[in-house]
Amino acid sequence: MDNWLKQEIWSKTQHQDITSDDCLLLSTDWVEFLQMSQFLKQKLLQLLNCIKEKRKKAVIYPPDNKIMFWSYCCAPRDIKVVILGQDPYHGGQGTGLAFSVSYEHSIPPSLKNIFFELQRSDPLFHAPNHGCLNSWATQGVLLLNTVLTVEKGKAYSHSDLGWQWFTNYIISSVSEKLSNCVFMLWGTKAIEKSILIDSSKHLVLKAQHPSPLAAASQRVGTWPKFIGCDHFNQANKYLEEHKKKPISWALL
């Protein structure tokens, strides 16, 4: 299939030869782990070049040096938990990690609910006065948005640019190459990714999105409300059962 795409599609479109993987913005660990073919690398580079062109006409978040920040915070071999987000915060407060914000920004509503659920389920957890989740990532929590860029003030504005194939590839690669990871899928868009995950070798947890809108909804959904889902306790129990060090959620 890859050869056919290369011959029939890619050869007929303008593309740039890749002489160094640095242009992909990914950490070396992730380049080696994903083992993307030359065709897929060119496809990713084309997407990144598209983002550069869009920056000439609009404000795009996050900056180039933060698009793949998740890959520098959490090496593939260290992954224990995967938490999927939708797209970066469109107000510019994102850091390149799903749900996380830099220290100088206020804590967004969805992250406040994440902290609330942690306080409810873990008596040792005390909500911090910031929303930086870097310490989770360095413990092995992959905080991955399924769309990696966004235009200022326009939520999900880059959903049709082509990020989905790349993040789907990441999710399926983690599922295939690793074992006994916990996938936390919150909200419809994240839950749709469950088809990419082998539930026979990983724990897949599903709940409604932690946003206040979902929390306030009176509609009876297929999945449990986020508040009360107990995902953080379930994750650590599973990790301990499989001889892995649990995540210190309180370490922020």
Curated annotation (Swiss-Prot):
Full protein name: Uracil-DNA glycosylase
Any single Gene Ontology cellular-component annotation: host cell nucleus
HAMAP family, per database record: UDG
Reactions performed catalytically: Hydrolyzes single-stranded DNA or mismatched double-stranded DNA and polynucleotides, releasing free uracil
GO molecular function: uracil DNA N-glycosylase activity
PROSITE patterns xrefs: U_DNA_GLYCOSYLASE
Taxonomic lineage of the native organism: Viruses, Duplodnaviria, Heunggongvirae, Peploviricota, Herviviricetes
Organism this protein belongs to: Saimiriine herpesvirus 2 (strain 11)
UniProt keyword list: DNA damage, DNA repair, Host nucleus, Hydrolase
Calcium among keywords: no
Main location as per UniProt: host cell
InterPro entries attached to this UniProt entry: UDG_fam1, Ura-DNA_Glyclase_AS, Uracil-DNA_glycosylase-like, Uracil-DNA_glycosylase-like_sf
EC class name: hydrolase
NCBIfam families per record: PRK05254.1-1, PRK05254.1-2, PRK05254.1-5, ung
Function field: Excises uracil residues from the DNA which can arise as a result of misincorporation of dUMP residues by DNA polymerase or deamination of cytosines. Therefore may reduce deleterious uracil incorporation into the viral genome, particularly in terminally differentiated cells which lack DNA repair enzymes.
Highest rank taxon of the organism: Viruses
Active site, renumbered: 87 (proton acceptor)
Annotated EC: 3.2.2.27
Recorded name of the encoding gene: 46
